[in-house]
Amino acid sequence: MRISLIAALCAGLATPSLAADSWTLFRDPKGTFTVEFPGTPAANHSSQPASDGTSVEETGYSLNTGTSTLMVLDSDFSRYKVDPIAAVENAATAAKNTAAQTQMEAVTHLDGQNGRALVVVDKNGNRMTDRIFFVGGHLYQVVALAPASLPQADSDRFVNSFHFAAH
């Protein structure tokens, strides 16, 4: 489902690092999370088919910088009975299945939430830095795509700036 969006955004990546002072805090309209983007992200709403024939609403916030694509995907599974651990593992497996190489994979913890951290490189030489969490019936995927030849600093800054809002 989200793999096609990620693959489409891999095309045409390559230029220098982003200016440190251009990053600003973005708060999603629902107030669920914050993340830093080096500009204003575009919002995209779509429906993805679920295994039972219904659809899962997905909201994405993304920014193509010319050197990379930075995005947060929010898939709303709140109408379904979903095993949070399995949802995170399935998303991680889907990301690894698109990769030619897995550079890093680990359990991660953020704001009291458990998740997965991945860095994979696809057959075209694009690196995907990914953080995956399942919180409150939503699957969150924080993704930075950039050519593997570029330094990892901007990708790390983006995924590490993501936080769940305190409620």
Residue ranges and their predicted role:
Residues 3-13:
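Sec-dependent N-terminal signal peptides
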Residues 15-19:
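Sec/Tat signal peptide C-region and signal peptidase I cleavage site
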Residues 21-37:
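Short N-terminal segments immediately surrounding and downstream of signal-peptide cleavage
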Residues 29, 41-43, 87-99, 138, ...:
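Surface-exposed amphipathic alpha-helical segments
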Residues 30, 39-41, 76-77, 122, ...:
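A mature extracytoplasmic/lumenal domain signature
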Residues 30-32, 65-68, 123-125, 137:
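Glycine-centered tight beta-turn/hairpin loop motif at sheet-sheet or coil-to-beta transitions
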Residues 36-60, 90-135:
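Signature of long, low-cysteine stretches enriched in small and polar/charged residues
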Residues 58-86, 140-142:
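A short acidic-to-branched-hydrophobic micro-motif
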